[in-house]
Amino acid sequence: MAKIMVAMSGGVDSSLAAALLHEAGHDVTGVTLHLWEGDDDRLAESLCCSQEMTESARRVCAQLGIPYYVFNYQREFRRYVIEYFLREYASGFTPNPCLECNREIKFRALLARARTLGFDYVATGHYARIRADETRHNGEDAGLPPAERAQRTTYRLLRAVDREKDQSYMLYMLGQDDLARLIFPIGEYTKAEVRAMAAARGLASANRPESQDICFVPGGDYRNLLREERPDALRPGPILDLEGREVGRHQGLPLYTIGQRRGLGIATGQPMYVTALDVARNAVIVGPESALRRESLRAEWVTFVSGMWPEAPFDCLAQIRAHADAVPARVIPGEAGTVDVHFSRPQRAVTPGQAIVFYDGDVVLGGGRIARD
């Protein structure tokens, strides 16, 4: 029997994760991370930090008869996620704050706290799988001491069985020490199976709808947050075509992203898309749809799940956004955490600031941030 901390959002996925581990005989404790204090009705009730979701997690733990606690990580969330989010936008990148939340809060900080409190493992409701050597690890072998597991096992991170819900792209930053202490109990199930299993157990969260929003930007409209927190970053400037001709004016680089067509306020006689954000000139660059396609990119801050930097170029599948298809690519390792990636076919709207993740079939090799040219 292992002592397992389950990170619970109040949704059905983490609720079932807790239930499955409890049923398997483990000593399970549920925890919710309080990350963001919404004011002026910014925080919707369906979002992970809302009072309603916290109460949902509490009710599930009461049903299961397991302890439940709320950890306050607002200060860390502000520092590592919100400030990053604002800084990246102000610098002409399009960030993915959920990646930083996973990296700094949900895994780095929570794993450290779990270790301090004497827990063997942390479990979450993520749709992904961990394989120890050739043996799938989803909680069945959680009785092994973590130190022993880590010493004798190589861990691989895999896509979930449910490809529509797969979250492995968001977990590429996990390393061997992380995977040795993590459990993803629902990675082998489809979402429909998860809901059915939760309903069969009478879990209060069985039919709770999912939220697709960034937790501190309900509705996906980050512009108001930028206006409140970084008004200096919203400097008007020119919209330039590919020949450098001014075809309009923009209201601030952070309000635009690669591939955007709507809301440009320009009339050029043909559809025009944002192809680049030129920070040096404070200019939005636009061009035809064909100009969005890229055959290669450079990635920075690259890490590999194995913990080992590749010594030679390698072929893999590369995915440039959370819900994009992974396509064949060749990765050429560089220096200081950078790689060059050459695609087998041009990719549309490659966006600096987003993540690129490398796969070998279902296995996550690693990933990094797409750099600016």
Swiss-Prot record:
Its main location: cytoplasm. Residues 165-167 are annotated as: Interaction with tRNA. The active site is at 101 (nucleophile), 215 (cysteine persulfide intermediate). GO terms for biological process: tRNA wobble position uridine thiolation. Its EC number is 2.8.1.13. Disulfide bonds join 101-215. GO terms for molecular function: ATP binding; tRNA binding; tRNA-uridine 2-sulfurtransferase activity. It catalyses: S-sulfanyl-L-cysteinyl-[protein] + uridine(34) in tRNA + AH2 + ATP = 2-thiouridine(34) in tRNA + L-cysteinyl-[protein] + A + AMP + diphosphate + H(+). The keyword Chaperone does not apply. It is found in: Cytoplasm. GO terms for cellular component: cytoplasm. Keywords: ATP-binding, Cytoplasm, Disulfide bond, Nucleotide-binding, RNA-binding, Transferase, tRNA processing, tRNA-binding. The keyword Disulfide bond applies. Belongs to the MnmA/TRMU family. Catalyzes the 2-thiolation of uridine at the wobble position (U34) of tRNA, leading to the formation of s(2)U34. This is tRNA-specific 2-thiouridylase MnmA. It comes from Roseiflexus sp. (strain RS-1).
